[in-house]
Amino acid sequence: MELKKTLNLIDIFCLASGSMISSGIFILPGIAHSKAGPALFISYFLAGILAMTGAISLAELATAMPKAGGDYFFVTRSLGPAIGTISGVLSWFSITVKSSFALIGMSIFLAKFISFDIVYIALFFCVFFTILNIIGVKEASIFQIVVVIALLSSMIAFVVFGIPHIKKENMLPIAPYGVLSIFSTAGFVFVSYGGLLKVTSVSEEVKNPSKTIPHGLLISLFIVAILYSLMVIVATGILPNHILDKSLTPFNDAATAFGGKLWDFILTISALLAFISTANAGIMSASRYPFALSRDKMIPDIFSKINQKYKTPVFSIIFTGIIMSIFLFLNIELLAKVASSTLILTYILANSTLIVIRESKMMNYKPKFRSPLYPYLQIFGIMGFLFLLFEMGYFVLMLSSLLIVFSLFVYIFYGRIKVNREYALLYLLERITTKNYTNHLLQEELREIIRERDEIEIDRFDKTVEKNKIFDLKGKYTYDQILNLISRETSQNLNIDKNLIKNFILQREKESSTTLSNFVAIPHLILEEPKRFEIFFFRIKDGTEFGDEKDVKMIVLIACSRDERNFHLKSLSAIAQIVSDKKFEKEWLSAKNEKELKEILLLTERKRIKPSI
């Protein structure tokens, strides 16, 4: 069963923003300031720049393959099911932990007003958001829009009203712990951008994903990164260093300093909105990873069951909610560090995935958005992420390694038995070694994804192309040689003597040339048998003489009865649109085999033929 496409640009913007803005900005700045000093705003901005590399890579991948599971789906199709399983588990764990941490943060702030144990408050909201996401993703996203707009408004107000109260002496010296501390602290605060890439996990539910996903992701990242930096500058400029270094509520303290209890209340509400939006977006995004893993047969089928009424993956959502509730009782600080390291690993995989899938040169990889500065942007991102990862320390790396081992265990003892999947790395190996490792299955899957993405209806021309053979000819041919070959190859299928076919083509060519250009010729035959339509495609990579042309690379022979004249004309129009595409000739000549030639004919953009009434 398909997921509903209900999310638009404002939904994606708010989902991305709501996933990012949380404890990373409302709690961490005080601790981070003790590591970097007043230059902390640079650390936040550097972390945002690195996050941009992953966001751009994921935006391209999401426009090529808008499927539930986001980065897990892309990694699996690029690096293989083993690495894909690792990616899915890491991503799910990272978002789930961050969401749990947001619930705890929310409980701490609510404790100002409610005299309940913070864990029980967090549990209540965990159940609430789980139910909200079961009811439907659109209902959850509407809630997200309201929360994020209110949150961003209060953050902007804090900056605008706080700037006049900045004291110069609090900003100096700007880097008391050295320049290197700025970079290491960027790793510490990187979790602040933790929800950004996870928006792609709901890409299958997005309207017009080719534009909506990249625009929503990049606009969200730009606005949030600027707001983070400005808010940190305001808090740093208002609070003395010795106070800010020890504060777990830095913006509340800064707001109280310039605006009293009213501003403290406003910032408390802002923090609560941030935690609410992160928890809600976290359950929505995290639950799509078990769903995607299950749909790929990596984990049991129950995780991919979709509720008939609400069209949401109920068991996957409930399972994620249960695990989040368990995390509420654990050491949140340690889990937050592990979440940060697993998040960085997923960013590394995102950039690596784009490089591999681009270099595989797969015919059906057709993103609507392409990363600028490829591959330099991705290489810069990978190197930067590796630096941040090793800055986090040995213990955190060991815990992340345990998660990787667990993911491999799941794949080896369940997923590997259930499924054998093609992936882009195999296509890249084919390019390097000239050996055959694939059966074109990934290309076919990508074709179906493109059809779903672009809402392409399979028309009669598609069906005709799919059922008929494409002839891939080697060497250069004279006019007589190519006519003999065409006549011989089509004679049996048409049940016509090969000499009659040859003579008919020659006679037709004398009356009027059938070459559409110096690249393609479209001869045709009239069949006496009623209701008959056949089409044969020939690629002559080294060229052939045909009529007056000396170097034709493509011949399309159409054989049809007189009562199929209408479809004959529509097919000619379809072929003309295909061969006039600016990329067609290059793709036609670079295709490796008959299957790739057929994919070009099926997926080159054209108007579809509507069935006759």
Report each predicted region and the residues it spans.
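C-terminal membrane-solvent junction of multi-pass transporters and transport-like membrane proteins
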Residues: 143, 303-312, 347-397
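A generic transmembrane alpha-helix motif of multi-pass inner-membrane proteins
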Residues: 342-343, 373-444
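Loop-to-transmembrane helix boundary motifs in multi-pass membrane proteins
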Residues: 4, 9, 81, 123, ...
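Membrane-interface loop-to-helix entry segments
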Residues: 107, 118-165, 176-179, 217-220, ...
